[in-house]
């Protein structure tokens, strides 16, 4: 029997095998390169046969590590060995049950490149994944036909933003990340900057549109109050009274006097919110605020677009509702 191979040599051979069989699989190779590839594959097989004691348990061990606690059904399209090696338990320690990609009721779905948390020298850093976004969850699969996800996480507490520092190639401006304080960061690359922005918008609206019991109660009880409140605002502007603001127009924040809330801000605790994250307005009619800032909500007219009208320190503007949270538990 041949002596055992050193551990670093075994790791090198494993990385080389991954590079040849996985990384080069989708590449267009010349005839000479294909011949060289076949020679290397044959030599790797010969080495395995010469050192069976070093490779006999490899397949079983890999399956156990890569399954990451999920059981794979017999008819699954995904192969266990193709499972992301960088997957980990969800942040809250819970398991999400297996669900087929085609069984999900989704807000958006499509192929993205997902960045692996850890990758070896030969392994690909970015992997093509079929991503599915529901009202509260983000799933990713090897393909849209998979019977079980490669990973999933709850959107609770997460937000999404562009990040042009993740890559240096042509997709530099197509990258975005989904992140939250003290949680794992998930990074993706779309096919275009526009597609990346669309994913971000859907993610932010999805995580912001998860209604709590208090929010549902508030919407029912205070619907009449909101309508009368808006009438008070526009009665002070006679030149605007004949042309009320519609859902397709941007409300003009600066002409509205600060004292036109008729004293409601002193007792209307349900309309007091605080900043959940820092927010810098991209346009003059958007309100800029920081984490913890107090904001009084004047109107929820643009709720379907993910925006409210708020007032802070005498300034009135549009506020992304996903960036604020109720100040009082009423």
UniProtKB/Swiss-Prot annotation:
Organism the protein comes from: Xenopus laevis (African clawed frog)
This protein's GO CC annotations: cytoplasm; plasma membrane
Biased composition (Polar residues): 247-261
PROSITE patterns listed in its UniProt record: PH_DOMAIN (PS50003), SH3 (PS50002)
PTM characteristics: Phosphorylated on tyrosines.
Record-linked Pfam families: PH, SH3_1
Domain spans labelled SH3: 268-329
Protein name listed in UniProt: Src kinase-associated phosphoprotein 2-A
Entry's localization field: Cytoplasm
Residue ranges, annotated region (Disordered): 53-77, 228-261
Family per similarity comment: Belongs to the SKAP family.
Keywords assigned by UniProt, alphabetized: B-cell activation, Cytoplasm, Phosphoprotein, SH3 domain
GO terms of biological process kind: B cell activation
Role noted for this protein: May be involved in B-cell and macrophage adhesion processes. May play a role in src signaling pathway.
Every PH domain range: 105-208
């Amino acid at each position: 029997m041949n002596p055992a191979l050193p551990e670093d040599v075994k790791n090198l051979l494993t990385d080389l095998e991954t590079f040849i069989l996985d990384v080069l699989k989708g590449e267009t190779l010349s005839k000479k390169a294909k011949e060289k590839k076949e020679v290397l594959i044959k030599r790797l097989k010969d080495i395995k046969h010469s050192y069976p004691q070093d490779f006999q348990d490899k397949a079983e061990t890999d399956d156990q590590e890569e399954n990451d606690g999920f059981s794979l059904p017999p008819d699954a399209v995904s192969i266990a060995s193709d499972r992301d090696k960088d997957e980990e338990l969800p942040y809250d320690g819970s398991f999400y049950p297996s669900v087929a990609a085609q069984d999900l009721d989704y807000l958006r779905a499509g192929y993205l490149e997902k960045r692996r948390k850890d990758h070896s020298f030969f392994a690909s850093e970015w992997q093509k994944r079929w991503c599915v976004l529901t009202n509260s969850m983000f799933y990713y699969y090897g393909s849209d036909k998979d019977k079980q996800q490669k990973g999933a996480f709850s959107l609770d507490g997460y937000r999404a933003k562009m990040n042009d520092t993740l890559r240096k190639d042509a997709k530099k401006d197509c990258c975005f990340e989904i992140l939250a304080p003290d949680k794992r960061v998930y990074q993706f690359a779309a096919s275009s900057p526009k597609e990346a922005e669309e994913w971000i918008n859907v993610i932010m609206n999805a995580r912001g549109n998860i209604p709590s019991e208090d929010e549902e109660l508030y919407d029912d009880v205070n619907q009449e109050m909101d309508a009368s409140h808006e009438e008070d605002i526009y009665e002070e502007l006679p030149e605007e009274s004949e042309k009320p603001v519609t859902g397709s127009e941007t409300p003009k924040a600066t002409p509205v006097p600060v004292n036109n809330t008729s004293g409601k801000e002193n007792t209307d605790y349900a309309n007091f919110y605080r900043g959940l994250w820092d927010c810098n307005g991209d346009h003059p009619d958007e309100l800029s605020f920081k984490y913890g800032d107090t904001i009084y909500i004047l109107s929820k007219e643009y709720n379907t677009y993910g925006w409210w009208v708020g007032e802070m320190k005498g300034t009135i503007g549009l506020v992304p509702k996903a960036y604020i949270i109720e100040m009082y538990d009423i």
